[in-house]
Amino acid sequence: MDHKLYLRIKKTNQHLYAYVLYKGKQLVTVSTNQKIIRNDINKVNKKIYPEILGYLLSDKIKEFGFLNIYLKRTYLFHGKVKTIVDVLRKNGVVIY
């Protein structure tokens, strides 16, 4: 049994969710449905909110001290998923 940290990104028609999982438990959760982001989404271009989500997720990941995370590939690696992962990598999180 491997005990790795996994990044899972879930997309719905209206929102994005990003979780960091360890042994099936959520350690860090960020979504566009959170009050902080939801109020600002209407004011910005919808192409920017995956970046906002990535910056918030990287801040929370750094608070916990996680540096190496494996990506659970549930979606194709392009578009919003790629944007979130690129922002995480730019902020120093190593994604495998």
Swiss-Prot record:
InterPro entries, A to Z: Ribosomal_uL18_bac/euk
GO terms under biological process: translation
Localization of this protein: Mitochondrion
Molecular functions (GO terms): structural constituent of ribosome
Protein name: Large ribosomal subunit protein uL18m
GO cellular component: mitochondrion; ribonucleoprotein complex; ribosome
KW Chaperone (keyword) present: no
Family, per entry: Belongs to the universal ribosomal protein uL18 family.
Keywords noted in UniProt: Mitochondrion, Ribonucleoprotein, Ribosomal protein
